[in-house]
Amino acid sequence: HNGTYVSGVFIGDEVVAAAFAFPGVDNAGHLHLHSHMAAVKEKYRNRNIGSALKWHQRAWALEHGYETITWTFDPLVRRNAKLNLIKLGVRVFEYFPDFYGDLPDALNAGDPTDRVIARWELLTNQVLAAASNQNLEQSGSGIAVALEKIDGKPVQHEISLNSSQVLCYLPSDIIEVRSQEPALALEWRLALRNQLQPRLNAGWHISGFTSDGAYIVSNNKREKVR
């Protein structure tokens, strides 16, 4: 009744996924929809339910006059990156260290809750391509590597902020790393923060994700909504 969005995915009588969003206003005064929660029960994951939920959210948003949806996600979680950047076509412009403070749940306990803001500009060519099931995976060939994975550990390289693009690789499964080697998980968190936060603060954005698990971080202008 107040411009919010609530949806659920049912299998029989069981709710297996749900999403909730509300109106927001950015610093420039532009109205958007902020997706506060979207989740799929663990046993139903990897069935494209999450992406179907987001596409339903997009259709609802356009019907109600929104052209942008935002939400937070953990940039260290590889499946999050793949869903958001490849399946949905979002862009990322903001990085917030320890966004939620300490969280005691099984996924986050003991790890800083760094988050990025996914910005889903619903009418850009990138999103329209994703909507038509075009493969948005990109090649990192020829791009300098700022953060790589060697024997499961993060290795950073100093690359000038004046460069045009860099790659930042992610661990294969940070959730597993957190449960088995929390010190290594923290090392990954701080390394990715060190590479992403200064660049995004300087006007860069995450423009893509490669097939072998790296963010493409670009120092160029964002695409405008058509």
Each model region followed by its residue ranges:
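Conserved GNAT acetyl-CoA-binding A-motif
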Residues: 61-74
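Conserved catalytic-core motifs of GNAT/GCN5-like acyltransferases
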Residues: 72, 82, 89-108, 208
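Short, cationic low-complexity segments
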Residues: 132-166, 190-195
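A conserved acidic, glycine/proline-rich C-terminal tail/linker
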Residues: 179-201
